[in-house]
Amino acid sequence: MASEILVNIKEEVTCPICLDLLTEPLSLDCGHSFCQACITADHKESTLHQGERSCPLCRVGYQSENLRPNRHLANIAERLREVMLSPEEGQKVDRCARHGEKLLLFCQQHGNVICWLCERSQEHRGHSTFLVEEVAQKYREKLQVALEMMREKQQDAEKLEADVREEQASWKIQIKNDKTNILAEFKQLRDILDCEESNELQNLEKEEENLLKILAQSENDMVLQTQSMRVLIADLEHRLQGSVMELLQGVEGIIKRTTNVTLQKPKTFLNEKRRVFRAPNLKGMLQVFKELKEVQCYWAHVTLVPSHPSCAVISEDQRQVRYQKQRHRPSVKAKYFYGVLGSPSFTSGKHYWEVDVSNKSAWILGVCVSLKCTANVPGIENYQPKNGYWVIGLQNADNYSAFQDAVPGTEDYQPKNGCWRNTGLRNADNYSAFQDVFQPKNDYWVTGLWNADNYNAFQDAGKYSDFQDGSCSTPFAPLIVPLFMTIRPKRVGVFLDYEACTVSFFNVTSNGCLIYKFSNCHFSCPVFPYFSPMTCKLPMTLCSPSS
């Protein structure tokens, strides 16, 4: 009953043109009402074709100025629209929300289901409509395809989401590691500065101790000198105030004593001759530290392998070597079999390793080519680049040296009668002449450039006995280049750059300062790490990166 009443009321407030509930209804003189938009559109169309205005239902003419809004119908239509749009009355059943009719048709243009009244309305006029049963299967298939496509896209989206999360986690880990590295690097830098500060303070304390000790001794000497003068002055005053006999008794001796008195000046130190403290070159220190970090990226896992009968004993883990005295008396050559080779050998690339030489008083380390290539036993006379050895060493706990090639054929360029200049000029094309002349033992402390690329320091020609006990001498001993160490190295880093033909040594204890570098090396065979503990019984130990 209520449904029939709603249908009847709906018919009263339905626009005859659009068949929809009235929107802003206008009433004509004949009493019929239409939507404002519908009657306006009909008025324009009728004026264009017929030239007069008439009601679309009864064709009774009307004047546009007589159109009046119908508030009553507008309110009824609005209330009815609210009732029809409620879920209980409209969408609960398959009925049109506007007309209350069953939704049996599908409008292809709008893509919506409509009722038969909607099909006849102006909104759907001329559109292609089908029964819902006819198009349901077609659109079900389309929706199934769309569903599968969306599921694939969903999987892709989930994968992208997972990738983003994985990348986010990776970045977090990377940034965390970078943060850890930054903290570690700057801690090392602070440790370097703390170490430099400690060294400077220790040097200053040693200087203070030495200065005060010397000045205290000078003070004691001055006190004794003053006391001696006071005694002599008292003797003179006593003689002058005493009798003639006291005056003349031994007068020549005391006059001679006063004449021989020499005022001893105290030992002092001029302030301008003191070593003036200067803050360390932080930029240079950072550069040195950076270079060490760069070469440490090429860390090689090196183990020790005896290459010949040797006095050197290797540990079970093949990471440590030490000297062991042989019971039998070795031959002249065999006594120098202290060295061992490292494994693996290198024929290309960059490689770095570190050796702990703490507290040792003697050692030799570096690289050498295969003994099969050189046919040389590792004696001191063969520690030369031309023989396939690029090494540095320590002797007598304090003498650090690098072993360079001996300079043969310089006997013809020995200076005669002190004519250094003339000899050098006559033989300017022969660099060996300058090497023989410009040596510290000849009062020359110089550096030089040769062939536009080779820079050299001129040292005294080495003698075989300089680095050993002198039991065996040879004119072909290597040129031993003294190395000055401000900080005694406990760990020495060795860096081989095969393609660049260089071997570099770093003082890891001194924050990676370069000790020595061999350039223009000729590697014609595989290159092996080389270690010699010499006759010092303390071990040499290969270090691990984590240590």
Swiss-Prot record:
Biological role: Capsid-specific restriction factor that prevents infection from non-host-adapted retroviruses. Blocks viral replication early in the life cycle, after viral entry but before reverse transcription. In addition to acting as a capsid-specific restriction factor, also acts as a pattern recognition receptor that activates innate immune signaling in response to the retroviral capsid lattice.
Modification Phosphoserine occurs at: 86
Stored InterPro entries: B30.2/SPRY (IPR001870), B30.2/SPRY_sf (IPR043136), Butyrophylin_SPRY (IPR003879), ConA-like_dom_sf (IPR013320), SPRY_dom (IPR003877), TRIM/RBCC (IPR050143), Znf-RING_euk (IPR027370), Znf_B-box (IPR000315)
PROSITE patterns, per the entry: B302_SPRY (PS50188), ZF_BBOX (PS50119), ZF_RING_1 (PS00518), ZF_RING_2 (PS50089)
Binding-site residues for Zn(2+), renumbered to this chain: 96, 99, 118, 124
Subcellular location: Cytoplasm; Nucleus
UniProt feature coiled coil, ranges: 132-224
Zinc finger (B box-type): 91-132
Gene name in the database record: TRIM5
Superkingdom of the source species: Eukaryota
Protein name: Tripartite motif-containing protein 5
